[in-house]
Amino acid sequence: MESLHARLFPGLSINIQRSNGLIHPANISTVNVEKSCVSVEWIEGGTTKGKEIDIDDVAAINPELLQLLPLRPKDSLPLQENVTVPKQKRKSVNSKIPALKEGLRSRSTRMSTVSEVRIPAQENEMEVELPVPTNSRKQFAIPSHPRASCSTVTELPLLMVSEEAEEQAHSTRSTSSANPGNSVRRKSCIVKEMEKMKNKREEKRAQNSELRIKRAQEYDSSFPNWEFARMIKEFRVTMECSPLTVTDPIEEHRICVCVRKRPLNKQELAKKEIDVISVPSKCLLLVHEPKLKVDLTKYLENQAFCFDFAFDETASNEVVYRFTARPLVQTIFEGGKATCFAYGQTGSGKTHTMGGDLSGKSQNASKGIYAMASRDVFLLKNQPRYRNLNLEVYVTFFEIYNGKVFDLLNKKAKLRVLEDSRQQVQVVGLQEYLVTCADDVIKMINMGSACRTSGQTFANSNSSRSHACFQILLRTKGRLHGKFSLVDLAGNERGADTSSADRQTRMEGAEINKSLLALKECIRALGQNKAHTPFRESKLTQVLRDSFIGENSRTCMIAMISPGISSCEYTLNTLRYADRVKELSPHSGPSGEQPVQMETEVMEASSNGTSLTGNEEEELSSQMSSFNEAMTQIRELEERALEELREIIQQGPNWLELSEMTDQPDYDLETFVNKAESALTQQAKQAKHFSALREVIKALRLAMQLEEQASKQINSKKRHQ
């Protein structure tokens, strides 16, 4: 094989075989002795192509290279007994033998021995002078030969090959010519490397498949998201948990933002949902958000949120109350205003936390924050330091639904929110009830909760669709001393839950979102001590205006979240809203956990993730802006229409009274005529009110049409995404 390496050099033309079986000539560009291969190039279709071929393949396709091994000059000389050739003193031999022709390479010539060849002396023109040893001064000369037979003589030494090499080459040629398509070719180095890589990939896939099967046996694969459940379980094993306990100290905050996780309910357990929320410490919460990569690989994106307090599913209402609303009770005895909000998705446990344990439509009000705060109020009221203030405890309970206020303790009477001459917000007609003990408060809570507006959503069949506000008022000699407002906010997912609902539901969702945004801005303004508080943006913040102003005002927000995987999006929205209220960074907590990503090689058939481009977001934003403008216009025109109607009713004649007067058998006709004339005169004076009412109703109809059109455009855009 070393002799074959010597025959191969850059520029030599050899035959090669392509992958499709085609054999054609190509030129050698490089020879790699270490890898035992050569690189060849050829021109095809006007472009230069190349490949790498093993030396063994070259020998198999070009067997003539094995036959044309050159002989050294000394091997072509006859051996003579009386001639000794010293190795160091040999003189050069000048030869005029012509170059070997290409046609002779394919000729098979065999010679037995060189000594059998007899060359006439007169035909040789080559003279070789050999040195003679010192003890013998004789000279020997090779006979010369005539020039005519030089070509025949020079062919014979160069074409000498061993019999074994000739037989091997002959068998190779005969096999290749007989079955050219079935000839076994040795593979190049690149092909061998590719096959090694392929084998490694197949081995790795087999190992991963076995690992997945083994893991699947450890988990119930009937669960829809058992892969995510396994990843979450493996992640929780690595966590160091230090949950909140009753013995932990209570910290004083002007704005306290907490989060509470509820356990999985019966519906979620029946659907075999998994818990995607972890509470590793008393102020940190993790959301294990399920994700899919582009190649449909499942993984978790663990997002961290830091709050003042974080309650897991084992925390009771008593523990939540101890760290949230209880510190605020002291504030109202010091002449301040305190507010506690329960915010979150429908079905996340807001009403359970604020009002008490729910059993169907009935509620145990004694286990809620409403009743707990009332008990503490009476305990402090009876203490010696506050006994001399002669404080009286009053309660009110009202709801805000679609921008309107209703008294839950007065047969759900509609109330008006106005500002007096001192720019104080007054809820006209709101009934305040004097209570003397906690049991009286519980009765009021049960009575008001039964009248609260509710509706059906995907998450809850009996969902509270209004903001319920329970207020505890402390008065001394008729003057307000302190006020504690406990607010159970409406669910924050209504807009997404009813994408194809009627106008009433759309207006309901728009009002809820508007009030929640206004509430966030008011709380942030309170925390940053801003001069301006945007409380006029919604009825909710307008009613609670005095809770956002003043140095002695404190607020607590309890963000309620659902742990199920189907509520993950709403849970993240709730946590982001609560995070923006106080703008706490997830990296400012004591643990300093960083978001982590976990991966598993699980392939799925499809992905439900959608994304919006910049143009689509701008178009949807403009349509949403038009929808919000139409909703605001509808609210304003509705108020104006009601005012005009109220004026007509109050100042207009009482035609019903005249009609009832005629039902009397002995009514006074003179009196009837006088009242009828007076009524007609009043009717004429009210023409401007009728005209104004007509214009307002016309504008209201146009605004409703614009709202309907904007809503259809938004829904159509969402369906096409």
UniProtKB/Swiss-Prot annotation:
Motif (Microtubule tip localization signal): 95-98
All residue ranges annotated as the Kinesin motor domain in the record: 254-584
Compartments where located: Cytoplasm, Cytoskeleton; Nucleus; Chromosome, Centromere; Chromosome, Centromere, Kinetochore
Record-linked Gene3D superfamilies: Kinesin motor domain
Mutagenesis or variant effect for residue 294 to A: Loss of microtubule depolymerization activity
Binding locations of ATP: 260, 344-351
Gene Ontology molecular-function annotations: ATP binding; microtubule motor activity; microtubule plus-end binding
Region (Globular): 1-250
Residues with the Phosphoserine modification: 3, 19, 92, 106, 108, 112, 162, 171, 183, 188, 515, 626
Coiled coil: 614-652
Comp. bias (Polar residues): 171-182
Keywords in alphabetical order: ATP-binding, Cell cycle, Cell division, Centromere, Chromosome, Chromosome partition, Coiled coil, Cytoplasm, Cytoskeleton, Kinetochore, Microtubule, Mitosis, Nucleotide-binding, Nucleus, Phosphoprotein, Ubl conjugation
Function according to Swiss-Prot or TrEMBL: In complex with KIF18B, constitutes the major microtubule plus-end depolymerizing activity in mitotic cells. Regulates the turnover of microtubules at the kinetochore and functions in chromosome segregation during mitosis. Plays a role in chromosome congression and is required for the lateral to end-on conversion of the chromosome-microtubule attachment.
Family under the similarity heading: Belongs to the TRAFAC class myosin-kinesin ATPase superfamily. Kinesin family. MCAK/KIF2 subfamily.
Domain commentary: The microtubule tip localization signal (MtLS) motif; mediates interaction with MAPRE1 and targeting to the growing microtubule plus ends.
Subunit structure: Interacts with CENPH. Interacts with MTUS2/TIP150; the interaction is direct. Interacts with MAPRE1; the interaction is direct, regulated by phosphorylation and is probably required for targeting to growing microtubule plus ends. Interacts with KIF18B at microtubule tips; this interaction increases the affinity of both partners for microtubule plus ends and is required for robust microtubule depolymerization. Phosphorylation by AURKA or AURKB strongly reduces KIF18B-binding.
Name by which UniProt lists this protein: Kinesin-like protein KIF2C
Organism of derivation: Mus musculus (Mouse)
Gene designation: Kif2c
